[in-house]
């Protein structure tokens, strides 16, 4: 049998195999496209010496972020967060990075990554913090421990800057901002009314 005849003989079989493979791949893509994918991105520190690699994976209803750090080309470690959205905000001196995300219950959380040691050094739920409010009324000093919803707005030196709005125990609406020292359990450094 000549080469041309052999080619003609197997051509229908090859076509059928290609169609079958294409169909299987098409079905697999249709089934899995909404259940599993990942997006790799990165963020570089202001001084350019530290790179964080962010891998976003979605499987079914679960959205997960994995952040790994590299310094001088060496991969140190990684951390994972289950959330639909994750943001990173570098400190001016590049030594720390705030990792901001929202939990499944809707609480905004800010973790602090120490980029020198590669460790998470502070984790705080924004809805669990309280603010001690001072005012003078008829000669008395009143102190209220007020649960507040804080929004992280950025770094100022070693302090993390937050805006807040809340109502104290006397029903007075409060809003403003303060700087919190990440190394001392978010001690209030400054209280400013808007």
Question: Residue spans of the language-model regions?
Answer:
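N-terminal Sec-pathway targeting helices
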Residues: 4-21
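Acidic, small-residue rich beta-repeat scaffolds with periodic aromatic anchors
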Residues: 12-13, 22-37, 108-194
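Terminal domain-start segments
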Residues: 20-81, 176-191
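Blade-terminus and WD-like Trp-Asp/Gly-His loop motifs, strongest in beta-propeller folds
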Residues: 41-49, 88-95, 151-160
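Acidic/hydrophobic-patterned starts of short beta strands in beta-sheet-rich repeat architectures
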Residues: 51-52, 96-100
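Short glycine/acidic-enriched loop and turn motifs that connect beta-strands
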Residues: 57-60, 102-107, 167-171
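Beta-rich catalytic cores
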Residues: 84
